Design a protein with these regions (language model features):
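Acetyl-CoA-dependent GNAT
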Residues: 4-62
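Conserved acetyl-CoA binding element of GNAT-fold acetyltransferases
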Residues: 61-73
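Conserved G/P- and acidic residue-centered "switch" motifs that form tight phosphate/ATP-binding loops
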Residues: 79, 96, 108
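Conserved GNAT acetyl-CoA-binding A-motif
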Residues: 92-103
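Conserved catalytic-core motifs of GNAT/GCN5-like acyltransferases
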Residues: 103, 121-138
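Conserved active-site alpha-helix within GNAT-family acetyltransferase domains
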Residues: 107-124
């Protein structure tokens, strides 16, 4: 797994910071991944989690995406996912991941807003095939967002 490019990339955005938790294969998507805790720097409370998956290929690009995140219910609606994604984009760019694929369920409006605030473009909504592991977890459709990291002014503007 390539070293994580943290030099020159402070993992702090206002009151939110990312702390590296583990580096390991993703338990569902079976690709190397960096797992971070989202921390409210004012209180040191963990407000959520975000991970960056390093693999590419049809499963990642169509169904799983390079990024997964979860925000604790008490912290939703405060921009935690947007701040964390902004920080993760710096790392993805440093690792040469471009474009960054982000997927979410079509009815997950907050996640869709996070993608759109980041400058990601909705490419399509796809049906998840029955033999896909996320189908077995109950996920039937995915919005596919593409975030081009090397387009000037498109990222880090939310």
């Amino acid at each position: 797994m390539p070293p994580i490019p943290l030099t020159g990339y402070p993992l702090i955005d206002g009151w939110l910071g990312l702390e590296l938790d583990t580096v390991s294969p993703h338990p569902v998507h079976e690709v190397p991944a960096y797992f971070f805790r989202m921390i409210d720097l004012r209180t040191r409370a963990e407000v959520g989690r975000i991970n960056l998956r390093l693999g590419s290929g049809p499963h990642i690009e169509r169904y799983a995406g390079h990024v997964g995140y979860f925000v604790e219910p008490a912290y939703r609606g405060h921009g935690c996912a947007s701040r964390a994604l902004r920080l993760l984009v710096r790392i993805a760019r440093g690792l040469g991941i471009d474009p960054l694929w982000i997927t979410c369920d079509p009815d997950n409006i907050p996640s869709r807003r996070t993608c759109e605030r980041a400058g990601a473009e909705l490419i399509e909504i796809v049906d998840v095939p029955e033999d896909c592991i996320i189908y077995q977890n109950g996920q039937r459709r995915k919005c596919r967002y593409r975030l081009k990291l090397n387009e000037t002014g498109k990222v880090i503007s939310f």
